[in-house]
Amino acid sequence: MLIEERLLTLFKRNCQHTLTYWSVFFSFGLSIAFLGPTILDLKCRTGSTLQEITWVFFAQQLCLLIGSSSGGAFTKTLFSALLALFLSSLIISVVFSIIPLCYNVLLLAIAMAVSGLAMGIIDTIANIQLVSIYKKDSPIFLQALHFFIGLGALLSPLIAEPFISGHCLRSNSTENATEIIHHFRSSFRSPVNLPESSPLSGPVEERNVSYAFWIMALINLPVPIAVFVLMYQEKLLPFCPNSSPRLLDKDELAMETKAPDNTEMAELDDEVFLHSGHGNIFSCCTDGALRGLPVTFFLIHIFGGMVLFMTEGIMGVYAGFVYTYAVSPPMSLQSKMAGNLNCIFWAAITAGRLVSIPLSYRFKTVHLLLTNMAGVIVTLLLLMILYTNRVFLFVGTTFLGLFISSVFPCLVAYTEDILEYRGCATTVLVTLSGMGEMTLQVLAGTLIQKKGSYSFLVCGLVIGCLGFIFLLSVILSNHFHRKITGASKKAEITDGPAAPAPEKTAPEHKTAVIQPECIKCDFGLDHNGSKPAENT
């Protein structure tokens, strides 16, 4: 059997929760990818300059980082987590619908910032909730979760494509387009993809990109509805009749019938998980949460976060600057052909996450991480060596997307497993990955402008090597962490008092004495065991 029966049973038990969290990540992917293809239309609609429109997207990335770092605060209860997901996914649909009405760059910046905040909250909550449900079995479900990002990211430009107009260009359109693409990682094709036969001064077919945003708003609308239905099923809506029992109540009843002792332990683990720092990133730094923890606990958080800082940075840098690299010497590809590189990259990421679902079940997470990081470095190295080979640029883009696709979900599952699902790993990792995505793009863009397009590959290779070093540091920290925590657990077992054992057996002894008395009474015997004299 491809997947063992235990995992299928676990998935069936949490099916509605899991599908809901996957659907909100579809919203996340839908929001990530629509910016690139529509950038020139938004620039023309708002009448803004390149510098002004750049700040619009910077506002979205900054608020995405804020939402990621604070989203864990909503995971204290199931109600707050689902309510935050419902509002965030609904906000994304609202933002999609009002973007065509933003004829001012300030209004557009505010709309993008609100959208980024909602995306960050979705990112953190969905990861934490899945880890809390599946724990050691979470890698396969996290891979599927991040597959839905790629699915939404692929669908978004396909919707926008028929409605994009390219007539709002000036004579220096090539220079402007080159500058524009320097700032955005989410472009799936070139924003200056104009037919060569149509002059800029001639009549151009009028297209309304507003329809693209409204269609995406409608496509995203079932997501908040799905979250609302889950809240209803969980009896979390006070104004709705509670006709059916909660889904979790059914599971707890079934588990109670089969193994009450295991249920108590599971409830205890869930309680520990919810109150062990999986909140916002600042709640992880309180004195009570950090007291008595070994130094390896902090090193795992730091090194794991730096791995994602680098890998998510590579994704942002490559998706944002591969077009610029392709149209510049020595590649000098046509803009239409170069614009396909972004779509190939994101398609490879989506396919890689889909393939990683069975792989994460068959292989250890740490082995997948080492293979993926080594593949990223080798691919970037070959791209540097074969920097004039146009065919390998497309092949290398595909392999880079495949290798880097599953690093994020694998590392989240690996670090949470190291910390026994009692740390702040998910919140810290999501926050640092957002910081890397935003920071390294600016750094790489500056180097490309100063040193030329070839520095794009050099920058990617250096970042990849640093990420591999940090991954080895995580593995080494895990080795020492298990030694330290294993020694402390052995000491607790050795020094622990054995007094509670007799107390546990006392009630059993008591019931053993009472039961014969009850039986004797049923047979009409007195307390001394003799029949009462009836005929005397």
From Swiss-Prot:
Compartment annotation: Membrane
Coiled-coil boundaries: none
Organism superkingdom: Eukaryota
Keywords associated with the record: Membrane, Transmembrane, Transmembrane helix
Keyword Transmembrane helix included in the entry's annotation: yes
Membrane topology: Multi-pass membrane protein
Membrane-spanning ranges: 19-39, 53-73, 81-101, 105-125, 140-160, 211-231, 297-317, 341-361, 366-386, 391-411, 428-448, 456-476
Gene Ontology CC terms, in alphabetical order: membrane
Protein family membership: Belongs to the major facilitator superfamily.
Protein name stated in the entry: Major facilitator superfamily domain-containing protein 4B
Organism whose genome encodes this protein: Danio rerio
